[in-house]
């Protein structure tokens, strides 16, 4: 609604609308039209407007795509709320999380943390599960400096080979679940749309995809942590993945190994821990060295 308002004002008056104006429009106008908005956490609405504004600014400054209207049928639903006056609490003893406008919720807490809570993002994935991501301000201790550098060669047969000869196997996660997914997709095709059995099968497919994603991320996190911990400087090839997946024979295998996710993890973990991660040109003979 605020995106439509912003667009309408610009088309009629040729005037730019700020995120503060959009927030005021939401409080003064939209809450009158849609009574249920008064029941929603105010920070969730403000953050949604600020996210829309960030996407709008990105469209002009970084030539990104124009912000899209979100459908209520979107599989990925989420909102962010801010911490103030103890409105977000985590009880590790009772495994409960308290959020604004909600009572204490029982949760599976993955690990304890110490620090000041800044915000919480609540999301629902296609399988129907809910997740809460807590942003905490805490002191970070960098890894100790070491005199060890490495070059890594990314591949399909072996996911990664270091210049020291260390090999990380390709777990081929999609291949392991491929038969199960094909079977479930066939079952779904024979179900009556919008029936109870249709949604049950759809949920099974979503859970299978979720398992693939979580297994892959877990493997990549352990692998990237090991590479960062053992080396001060890490060098890899700057692969043009978008061009490579155009080869239909290799597309599935390339998507399964998730080179982009691995290099993304190496990049931010290197910054966190005082390491250096370097990407070299595609045409540099890195494979011969590794």
Explain the meaning of each model-derived region.
Residues 1-20:
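N-terminal cap/recognition module
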Residues 7-11, 60-65, 232, 270-277:
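Surface-exposed helix-capping loop/turn segments at secondary-structure junctions
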Residues 21-125:
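Acidic carboxylate diad motif detector
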Residues 16, 20, 24, 43-46, ...:
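An alpha-helix initiation/capping motif
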Residues 1-7, 48-56, 181:
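Short, Φ-rich (hydrophobic/aromatic) sequence segments
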Residues 113-116, 126-290:
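Positively charged, helix-rich recognition surfaces that bind polyanionic ligands
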Residues 8, 35, 39-42, 50, ...:
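Short capping/connector residues at structural and topological boundaries
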């Amino acid at each position: 609604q605020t995106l439509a308002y912003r667009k309408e004002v610009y088309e009629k008056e040729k005037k730019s609308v700020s995120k503060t104006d959009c927030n005021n429009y939401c409080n003064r106008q939209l809450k009158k039209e849609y009574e249920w908005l008064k029941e929603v956490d105010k920070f969730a609405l403000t953050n949604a407007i600020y996210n829309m504004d960030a996407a709008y600014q990105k469209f002009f400054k970084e030539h990104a795509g124009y912000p899209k209207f979100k459908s209520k049928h979107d599989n990925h639903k989420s909102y962010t709320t801010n911490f103030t006056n103890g409105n977000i609490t985590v009880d590790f003893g009772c495994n409960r999380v308290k959020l604004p406008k909600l009572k204490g919720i029982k949760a599976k807490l993955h690990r304890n943390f110490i620090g000041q809570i800044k915000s919480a993002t609540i999301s629902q994935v296609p399988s129907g599960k809910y997740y809460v991501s807590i942003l905490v301000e805490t002191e970070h201790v960098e890894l100790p400096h070491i005199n060890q550098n490495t070059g890594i060669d990314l591949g399909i047969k072996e996911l990664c080979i270091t210049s020291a000869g260390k090999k990380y196997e390709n777990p081929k996660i999609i291949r392991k679940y491929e038969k199960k997914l094909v079977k479930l997709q066939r079952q779904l095709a024979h179900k009556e749309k919008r029936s109870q059995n249709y949604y049950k099968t759809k949920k099974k497919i979503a859970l299978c995809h979720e398992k693939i994603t979580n297994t892959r991320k877990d493997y990549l996190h352990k692998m990237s942590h090991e590479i960062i911990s053992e080396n001060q400087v890490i060098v890899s090839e700057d692969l043009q993945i978008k061009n490579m997946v155009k080869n239909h024979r290799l597309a599935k295998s390339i998507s399964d190994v998730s080179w982009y996710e691995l290099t993304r993890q190496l990049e931010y973990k290197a910054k966190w821990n005082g390491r250096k991660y370097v990407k070299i040109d595609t045409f540099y003979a890195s494979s011969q060295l590794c």
